[in-house]
Amino acid sequence: MMRKAKAFMSLSTFYKYAKIFDNQTNRKLFKAKPKIGIRATKPKEIIHADVCVYRPLDYTKCFIYFIVDNFSRMILGWKISTEYKSSIMLENLRNVYCKYIFEKEKPPAILMVDDGIENKGLVCEAIENKEIKVDRWVAQKDVIFSNSMVEAVNKQMKYNFLFRHQLLDIEHTQRFLETAVELYNNRPHSALYGFTPVEVFNGAKPDKYFFKPQMEEAKMLRKAENKALSCDSCAFLLEKKE
């Protein structure tokens, strides 16, 4: 502009007039707020099914089938196999359905799955024939929500358990998962405010204010201890440091 002798002004003046004539140039960009996924109000209301892939030291491709309760984050059932097919998912689903008496749930539980082949075929037939009475929802197809709840559990099982150990083969991995799933289900979960998945599945109510009285008491005790420290003790610590 100045080189063509059209106008002469400082950079700040240029931006001033640019803002006047086009208010789009100074528009702030904001990141989209994270969306809250689908949430159940009680155990056995929504369950999620998914498969994750893991390779032990012999490089066998292992498929781990998980079924997770939405409300409690508890792993209700799992299977491991070198095959990726709906019959294994159906077997896992049947075991969970019978073990936790889903038949008595009114209305029927929602089964959230992705559009993978392991969730079609025999699984769809069993649901259509009322052998397994659940409502099957395909994530981001039948509903806008993703299947992130069980995907998060897959990630935790990989990074908190599987990837931290040298597992030789699929048999070794299966034995390890028997312990790992038990540990996961009985370990306090951050989303449950200190409760474990098993406790919440069995009736405990997650409450973020549950430990508030103890936290306030601990805070007051820390303040009292800090005030009780004399200047002499502080000076002693400083001299010792020097």
Which sequence ranges carry the predicted segments?
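Sequence-pattern detector for short linear motifs
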Residues: 19, 30, 42, 82, ...
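C-terminal domain-tail junction helix/linker
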Residues: 130, 156-242
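Short linear capping/connector segments at secondary-structure termini
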Residues: 32-33, 109, 197-198
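Basic, flexible linker segments flanking DNA-binding modules
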Residues: 1-46, 125, 143, 202-205
